[in-house]
């Protein structure tokens, strides 16, 4: 999903897209923060592979992918 780093232009476009398509900016920001916190604890517990991508960056990419490609979600 993510390489050693994240392109800053791509990351900003994904973040802008999340905010633009959201009905509530605050809730979107909270979702990103909550997901980043989960990923940070997953990294801490060793559940995720070692990565140089920061949890907030990973959260933005994951939420953007879920928004753009809902057919990838289980269920």
UniProtKB/Swiss-Prot annotation:
Record EC number: 2.7.7.6
> What gene name is given for the protein in this entry?
rpoZ
Record-level GO cellular component terms: DNA-directed RNA polymerase complex
**What InterPro entries does the entry give?**
DNA-dir_RNA_pol_omega, Pol_omega/Rpo6/RPB6
The record lists its disulfide bonds as: none
**Name of a matching Pfam family:** RNA_pol_Rpb6
**What HAMAP family does the record point to?**
RNApol_bact_RpoZ (MF_00366)
Q: Which GO terms describe its biological process?
A: DNA-templated transcription
Q: Which NCBIfam families match?
A: PRK00392.2-5 (NF001574)
Q: Does the keyword Transferase apply?
A: yes
Its quaternary organisation is:
In cyanobacteria the RNAP catalytic core is composed of 2 alpha, 1 beta, 1 beta', 1 gamma and 1 omega subunit. When a sigma factor is associated with the core the holoenzyme is formed, which can initiate transcription.
Q: Which reaction does it catalyse?
A: RNA(n) + a ribonucleoside 5'-triphosphate = RNA(n+1) + diphosphate
Listed A to Z, the keywords are: DNA-directed RNA polymerase, Nucleotidyltransferase, Transcription, Transferase
Role of this protein: Promotes RNA polymerase assembly. Latches the N- and C-terminal regions of the beta' subunit thereby facilitating its interaction with the beta and alpha subunits.
Query: What is the designated name of this protein?
Result: DNA-directed RNA polymerase subunit omega
Q: Name one GO molecular function term.
A: DNA binding
Q: Which family does it belong to?
A: Belongs to the RNA polymerase subunit omega family.
Q: What class of enzyme is it?
A: transferase
Species whose genome carries this gene: Synechococcus sp. (strain CC9605)
